[in-house]
Amino acid sequence: MRVKRYLVFWLVSALLVGPCLARGGETGGEEAFVQALEEDGFIVQKGRLGYLDLIKLHEAGLVPSAYGNNPATKYLAFFVPPAPGHTVDDQISQVQRPPGVSGNVSAFWNLRPDEAVVFVGRTPPECRYFCFDHIIMSRAYGNETRWLFANIADALNNLVIRTEGTPNGTPGNPYNQTTVIVATADRGIDQRIRAAARSAGYSDDAMNTQVFPASILNLGLENDSDTFAIHLRPALFTDQQAGDNYIDNTPATVLRVTPENATQLDPYGYPKLRVRGTGMTELDLTDDLEDLRNAILTRYSGLKARELPASAGFPAGIDAIQRGIDAVGPTNDAAYLWSANQTISSATPPFFNTSQYYGFLRDPAVTLGNDTDEFIIVYGVNHVATGKATYSSFAVYGADVWNGVGSITDLDFNGTAEEYLPDNPDAKYLYVYKIARNCDGDPRCFEVPYGAGGHGIDLDQPLLILWRIYLENATKTGPSYEEIVYDRAIKFDPASQG
């Protein structure tokens, strides 16, 4: 089986261990839109939205790792039919048949230069953040296929998306609003699809284009063409039940739109990027953070302390694309830090075993035993309080299989540093949180679960901490690494431990 088929097989297999795919309702507007597209000479195929439980997939033995799942939220993927005249591999169809899922969709797909993938429906209900991110998943380098998992350009997030509640991207209410997103490489195709949407009653003020720039992509349907994905990332729903309902039964439809006849190509150029940074930094809080560090070390002075490193975790998507390395699925809307001394920079095959790469994450290993005097203190600047983020979090992972077992968000940070710095007015901009095996009722502590499966981290399993810092309001993109103070962590052990 070719590598391309291998990729699709694993992603669709995930549906057997996760919830089923969601599909939007057949509204009159959607049907009129499809009819208008067909009348304009397009072949229209309906896809779906769905999410994959990477932990369950790993526990089922279908993939060797969990690939840095975000335990704070569930990401939806666009499941797209193959181009006309193409099919998903027969083996995949057989695998999907038992749960009754159509075998003719895939979360990984190719795209012709004259095609489009279209989202029509509603945005997520109110949440702290959401975005639609277009991604190059894999690329052929001669006889070698590499896993890139790299965002192509800026995401379409809740601060910039055009919806009925935010016409032309103006400020308003972007949640639970009708929108149309045309993901394409071609200007002419985009214009024709927009015209069809207008004829079906959709407002041009609620239409968006997600550009697949031909200048940096290998578009087409050949075995050496790039493989793509689009992910919808919602985070921290105001009403969790409404959020769960959206994930399970997304009120939207995904369409693959292909012209019946050859068309004169008019490719888009690479889109203009939003620029990180405002010139205002968190760096004046460095002294306060050092005071907090000293207060933590003083409180636990009877224990052995080991300060963990912190560095940027992942390369930017465009950096990974140019270097042919794995980017681990970043978005331009975030900054990523982790408890390691370097950023990853390895070329990897598809669905690689993470325990065979990135040895610096496990050497020297950080483990967490069950002694009451063994724990980790995570502390730093609350980036939401300083205005550098819309939301931020840290998550605990197994450092070998990258299984995220829990996440703490900035909602839990408020008021946690004052007890360490009671007379410091800047303590409100800082946080302290504990990671342990037994929190003994401490409300400011995360209890790391045991277990050899993906839902737990064994006593002797190395772990790491990953910080996510999302979306600065002033720039409508991720914060600049140069303007944030890096988060920190200290591992404490019994003084008698060797």
At which residue positions do the language-model features occur?
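Hydrophobic core
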Residues: 11, 15-19
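A compositional/structural signature for long, glycine/proline-rich flexible linkers
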Residues: 23-498
